[in-house]
Each structure stands twice: as structure tokens, then as C-alpha cells.
């Protein structure tokens, strides 16, 4: 379906099923973290999936391309981003499979029915509070800093919305790993799988991918590290596979 592009917007190829996404580089474009999260996550065709803080809809689009889930929903508080996500859904003729809802993560348990999702994904803001921000209202600030929601907001709402045995997938920063694990256990989301992401083999990890299961048993697998670059500008083969090249 043809859709209208607004000022400064562009259409990018997602390298999956011919899908495309509308983005505005002056606002916020999806990053590698969202792509790696979809490479780490698993879903089944019968699953009903929710993406919290969906932005321009990158995670629902990629998860639909990979797993053809029964239905996917993206929740996004910023109307401009939600509008781009809806138009991207229409651009790919996926209106019958993906819904984009404008709303606050803190209100997610009021927007959606309890225990109604098999799988929940989230690429949340990583940075605590508004430290160093000149304009907390900017879309990039809202996406990167806990201006409008906190880690606990994400985890507590996920715990209410996941079905028993449902899976939660999140990408975050290693410096908050202790807090993340404590929060997951507090809300009875048992950490089951973790993978650290390193920019180069000789550098410290700068991302961590986590899977938790609602009501799961206490046992976690730490997967082998994921290395992004073999040299500047050249991805490792695993990264090319995740991107679909």
C-alpha cells in the first residue's frame, strides 16, 4: 500500500520479506539493539505478542517477518512515532496482523487484558532519570532515558500481561544487570537465558539480551558472547545473519 511521507521522513528496507519501515532521522531511528533483540527472541506462529515502547514499530515488523505470529501489538506513548509505525504497518499491508496502540507503559495493564500475551518484548530506555539532558521532551531523550517510564514500570506491567509460562525478552545495558535480575525475580519473571553483546572481541560488553519466563523454574543459561564487529565497519558473520544479509 502506498502511504504518505511527512517532512524529513524516509523509507528503509528491512531486508526481511521485502518489509520496509518509515523513519525520520531527525527524530529517532531504530538501532542495532532492537535488531539483536529480535534475533535473540523466539516466538511461535500461534503466539500473541506485545512490544512495549515500540517506537516506529521495528520489533513487531521484524518479529512478524521471522515468526508470522498470530497477532502483534506495539504500544507507544509518542504519537508521532506511533503514527510512523502505523503507516509502516500499512506500507507492508500488515494491518490485519499488527496493531499500533498509542499509550503509556505505566497504563499498559489498564489498556490490555491481564495474562493475554504469550510473548512480550521491550527495548526500554537505558539511562536513569534526566541526568545530562537539555530537553527531556525530545523523542531521542524519551527513547534513551527513563523520563516517562522506569525499569520497574516495564517489568511490573509485563508480569501482569504475560500468560503463565509466557516469555519476556529485553535488551539493556550490562551496568544495570544486578538491578534487572533483582527486578525480574521480584515480579516472578524467572531469568532463563542471557547473552552479552560485545562491540569487539577485546572490548567490554555494551549490551545484554535477557529472556525471562513468568513463573519459570530457577535455572538460567548464559549463551556464548555475541561479537558485533570483526574490524571497523565489518560485522561478524552472526550479525549479518541476524540482519538478514
Tell me what each language-model feature is:
Residues 20, 71, 97-99, 190-193:
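Conserved beta-strand segments of alpha/beta enzyme cores
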Residues 40-133, 156:
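Conserved SAM/SAH cofactor-binding pocket of Class I
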Residues 148-199, 203-205:
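Conserved Class I SAM-dependent methyltransferase catalytic core
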Residues 23, 102-103, 172, 195:
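Short loop/edge segments at beta-strand edges and connector loops
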Residues 204-245:
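SAM/dcSAM-binding transferase cores
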Residues 2-45:
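Class I SAM-dependent transferase core
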Residues 15, 43, 94, 185-188:
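Short, structurally constrained coil/turn elements
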Residues 124-153:
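Mobile active-site "lid"/loop adjacent to the S-adenosyl-L-methionine
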Amino acid at each position: 500500500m502506498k502511504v504518505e511521507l511527512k517532512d524529513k521522513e524516509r523509507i528503509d528496507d528491512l531486508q526481511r520479506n521485502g518489509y520496509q519501515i518509515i523513519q525520520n532521522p531527525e527524530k529517532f531511528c531504530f538501532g542495532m539493539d532492537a535488531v539483536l533483540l529480535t534475533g535473540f527472541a523466539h516466538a511461535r506462529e500461534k503466539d500473541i505478542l506485545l512490544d512495549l515502547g515500540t517506537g516506529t514499530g521495528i520489533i513487531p515488523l521484524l518479529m512478524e517477518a521471522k515468526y508470522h505470529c498470530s497477532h502483534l501489538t506495539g504500544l507507544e506513548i509518542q504519537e508521532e512515532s506511533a503514527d510512523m509505525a502505523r503507516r509502516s504497518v500499512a506500507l507492508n499491508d500488515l494491518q490485519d496482523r499488527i496493531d499500533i496502540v498509542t499509550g503509556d507503559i505505566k497504563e499498559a495493564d489498564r489498556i490490555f487484558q491481564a495474562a493475554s500475551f504469550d510473548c512480550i518484548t521491550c527495548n526500554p530506555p537505558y539511562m536513569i532519570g534526566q541526568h545530562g539532558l537539555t530537553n527531556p521532551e525530545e523523542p531521542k531523550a524519551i527513547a534513551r532515558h527513563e523520563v516517562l517510564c522506569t525499569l520497574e514500570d516495564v517489568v511490573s506491567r509485563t508480569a501482569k500481561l504475560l500468560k503463565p509460562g509466557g516469555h519476556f525478552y529485553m535488551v539493556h545495558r550490562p551496568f544495570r544487570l544486578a538491578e534487572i535480575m533483582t527486578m525480574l525475580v521480584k515480579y516472578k519473571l524467572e531469568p532463563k537465558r542471557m547473552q552479552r553483546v560485545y562491540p569487539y572481541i577485546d572490548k567490554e560488553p555494551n549490551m545484554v539480551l535477557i529472556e525471562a519466563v513468568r513463573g519459570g523454574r530457577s535455572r538460567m543459561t548464559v549463551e556464548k558472547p555475541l561479537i558485533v564487529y570483526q574490524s571497523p565497519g565489518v560485522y561478524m558473520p552472526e550479525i549479518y545473519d541476524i540482519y538478514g544479509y
